[in-house]
Swiss-Prot record:
PROSITE patterns: AP2_ERF. It comes from Arabidopsis thaliana. One of its GO terms (molecular function) is DNA-binding transcription factor activity. The lineage of its organism: Eukaryota, Viridiplantae, Streptophyta, Embryophyta, Tracheophyta. SUPFAM superfamilies: DNA-binding domain. Belongs to the AP2/ERF transcription factor family. ERF subfamily. It holds the Pfam family AP2. It comes from the Eukaryota. It is found in: Nucleus. This is Ethylene-responsive transcription factor ERF015. Probably acts as a transcriptional activator. Binds to the GCC-box pathogenesis-related promoter element. May be involved in the regulation of gene expression by stress factors and by components of stress signal transduction pathways.
Length: 187
């Protein structure tokens, strides 16, 4: 029997990394990048093409994006990561099939609409509801930017971009302006 090749530190470290990733639940259509982001994409049946669904901070968000895209493509017949979750709302009254951009937009909004907390973070609330409407195709970039900016905050259901980013919020409170003695105490 020939002698076995010497063990390489590169092989053992790559196997170690693969083992560490297994502590997270695996989801369909989701993989972890080497720098820690979770990415999602879906294959279109019978064509072999892929639709990029984005990169996310948590595997659950990437899995929800995949579920939304799967629902757009296969309807109720798909095998979902979260089968009991409410499905995304598709645009009403559309006679044309959904485009790649439509599917990406629906997936991004759906992934950001409910935040699932991993089982190892039990001190936080289980879900956070954020309104998710599918924007018109001309407002996709603006809507995506707002969704990304307010994704981690609790918002009232009637919040708008204007009320979230108002000029009044950038001014100091009136009690700070009147009580300046505390500044003199610092000096």
């Amino acid at each position: 029997m020939p002698p076995s090749p010497p063990k390489s530190p590169f092989i053992s470290s790559s196997l170690k990394g693969a083992h560490e990733d297994r502590k997270f639940k695996c989801y369909r259509g989701v993989r972890k990048r080497s720098w820690g982001k979770w990415v999602s994409e879906i294959r279109v049946p019978k064509t072999g093409r892929r639709i990029w669904l984005g990169s996310y901070d948590a595997p659950e968000k990437a899995a929800r994006a995949y579920d939304a895209a799967l629902f757009c493509i296969r309807g109720e017949k798909g095998v979902y990561n979260f089968p009991t979750d409410k499905k995304p709302q598709l645009p009403e009254g559309s006679v044309r099939p959904l485009s790649k951009l439509d599917i990406q937009t629906i997936a991004t909004n759906y992934a950001s609409s409910v935040v699932h907390v991993p089982s190892h973070a039990t001190t936080l609330p289980a879900t956070t509801q954020v309104p998710s409407e599918v924007p018109a195709s001309s407002d996709v970039s603006a809507s995506t930017e707002i969704t990304e900016m307010v994704d981690e905050y609790y918002l009232p259901t009637d919040a708008t971009a204007e009320s979230i980013f108002s000029v009044e919020d950038l001014q100091l409170d009136s009690f700070l302006m009147m009580d300046i003695d505390w500044i003199n105490n610092l000096i």
